[in-house]
């Protein structure tokens, strides 16, 4: 049952009955105040702060305001003093008409928390109006045969004041024939009747003139007068008589104009002109004459303007039937106006709380009242809003409602709500009114900036100029205003050895990244760091993204020749036997490039040669080979210039210089060696002979094997000492130079040679070939394995 009651309170449609709804939002009872009408603007009614038990500052802090029906500003509330003051002169007659007492209902609306205080102000009447007759002159025709005691109706006066200030009685100037009586209608209005005291004599006095005075009960009293002119007529035996002394008729307020609502009828027993009857309104007010029209012949009473139940719900109309002799009869028509549903409901907005923070819970967004001028079911009202909105209507006090949010809102999903409040009455047909309220949702910093990518990869070519824009990061924030303003920063690198602050910087406003210095691919190929994005909300929210910077290689390094050495010392000389076949490997140029990729792809070509066409260079690996058979006519010494070029743009290059010496054979030394060299060679030869002799005479296989191994080990040790050459600095024709393999040739082509120049004989000698039968077998294998060997060379 409790859950059902909760659902009932949160229903979107609430039936409003114009009755007082007591609750926690309202005061326990209405406070009543009074003030006399016509008081000047600013007149003090009461001190609300004192009456409500609040401090003046609290009254202002809670946004106290006065709410009146129809949103009329009759009052003003001073937040400085807490006084309730008149905002304008109040005219009781204008506000309430004849209704007494005259009560103005108003509410004091307090917020934080929401509270209604119901109040009422009674407007006390002052005697500011005099009685007024509808006709300043009345003309009566009375037969001289009229009997004393006959009552003759007179036109009444009206006084807009009420109570004792209203019209109280009538008087007439003293005379011997008439006196006046004061009568009261059912609605309390007073009217006069003229009573004949003494028979009239036309021959003695054919006309009389009297003054009728209307007096109110004010202090001092006010009065109004009308002149009565009486004409004494000859005898007319019968006066007209109505079929009914009272007609009652109910008329719908939407009855069309010129509709006949009632027909009165009178008869006269006389004949001739004395029996001819005409009908007329008897001392009717201006409002009656504007609303109805009476046919003087037929007695049909028609509407001449639309009725309005909400303004006047009944009329009392006096009708006079007069014959040709001046005699008359009187009847009364009471018109009851029947309410129809012709007024749509009205909404009066008291306050709107907009914008509201998106993280606020159940919050009062608006306070409004509804009303309908109709009565009964026509004035009962039902309120509703759309079902798909996070709001509901909550009835408070009397005819007031509050529009309340169901909970926290999400500005990023929807920042503005146009709420249509539909008010429908229960009449037939039902009338409805729609009222739109716009509620704005203000932003709360509940969204952190979000990068467009979780990681960014940037490419920067080395040797860039400092302050170069290398890329950008971007983050967006779904919030608005300052909560969505993003600033960027570099976060401390995870690698403590990375000098990030000297490598890159970031523009805090737009996320542009800049290189602070020229980058060197050979020193730093790549690095990564984190970038933070922080909004300006309170508290600030942030996020981060990873940035990888890849340095692209530029062709900024020339090839470097490792072999042959180009250090300006003794040049390297390669020996080539004259018996070498075409394609014989002379040497190999070895070079490296500090760049990477295609910038480090090297190609070789023979740039210059002493004898063109004799040697060629393999373009891809730098091998220098013979291009044809050698002959005795070929010079013994050759100088080659090999160009090493990379594949960069633009390409870079280096030049290697080779010296080649053609020799007849390797069996005899070409040049004399130092004295120590022959002795070493002979000792080595004797050792070999000794090993062979011992091996041949050995009778035991095991002993021979062991001895052979020992001799071989001894041979290798001595061969190492014999192979060393002294390499002094200086030009080629000088001391011995070591031109043993530098590691750039394959093991098959490694050898050692010692050369000397000067006064010795022009001979050379191979001290020790590392691999026996090198020349014959190596050249033969090259020629047989690759018949198109020559095609892979580049000749110059």
UniProtKB/Swiss-Prot annotation:
GO terms for molecular function: calcium ion binding. Residues 35-133, 138-242, 247-347, 352-451, 456-561, 568-671 form the Cadherin domain. It comes from Pan troglodytes (Chimpanzee). The chain crosses the membrane at residues 691-711. Its main location: membrane. This is Protocadherin beta-3. Residues 27-690 are extracellular. The gene is PCDHB3. It holds the Pfam family Cadherin_2. It is found in: Cell membrane. Residues 1-26 form the signal peptide.
